[in-house]
């Protein structure tokens, strides 16, 4: 078991080292130009409950998570309908994160 942990730690170290070298090789100008290209490539996202059948990866983000394009067949219909929706488990996680953030603010007031 100890050998497995040592091998895993070694692999993680090697991967992080190799990825940091790749970033260091980029010059600042190249990095800025890459970021500028990424911003111009971005397109408008599809709001929640709107049709996303044209591009299933275009759904907007909520506070923490990206909405998912969900497709279904309405009752008695033959046409597939796709809309951007937030899965319930992510909705509950966002609510919990909001409550934790609010509670953290109260604790900060009490002891801050």
From Swiss-Prot:
Query: Hey, what's the signal peptide range on this chain?
Result: 1-20
Per the record, the domain comment is: The presence of a 'disulfide through disulfide knot' structurally defines this protein as a knottin.
This protein is called Toxin-like structure LSTX-D10
Q: Which InterPro entries match?
A: Spider_toxin_CSTX_knottin, Spider_toxin_CSTX_Knottin_CS
Tissue expr: Expressed by the venom gland.
Subcellular location field: Secreted
Alphabetical UniProt keywords: Disulfide bond, Knottin, Secreted, Signal, Toxin
Task: Tell me where on the tree of life, at the top rank, the source sits.
Answer: Eukaryota
The GO terms describing molecular function are:
toxin activity
Might you report a single GO cellular component term? Answer: extracellular region
Q: Which cysteines are joined by disulfide bonds?
A: 45-60, 52-69, 59-84, 71-82
- Those residues forming the propeptide, per the database entry, are 21-41
Segments passing through the bilayer: none
Member of which family?
Belongs to the neurotoxin 19 (CSTX) family. 01 subfamily.
């Amino acid at each position: 078991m100890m050998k497995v942990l040592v091998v895993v730690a070694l692999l993680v170290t090697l991967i992080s080292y190799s990825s940091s070298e790749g970033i260091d090789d980029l010059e600042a100008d190249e990095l800025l130009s890459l970021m500028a290209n990424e911003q111009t490539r971005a397109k408008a996202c599809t709001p929640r409950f709107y049709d996303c059948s044209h591009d299933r990866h275009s759904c907007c983000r909520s506070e923490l998570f990206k909405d998912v394009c969900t497709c279904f067949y309405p009752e008695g219909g033959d046409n597939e309908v796709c809309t951007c929706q937030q899965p319930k488990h992510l909705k509950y996680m966002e609510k919990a994160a909001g409550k934790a953030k609010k509670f953290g603010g109260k604790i900060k007031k009490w002891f801050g």
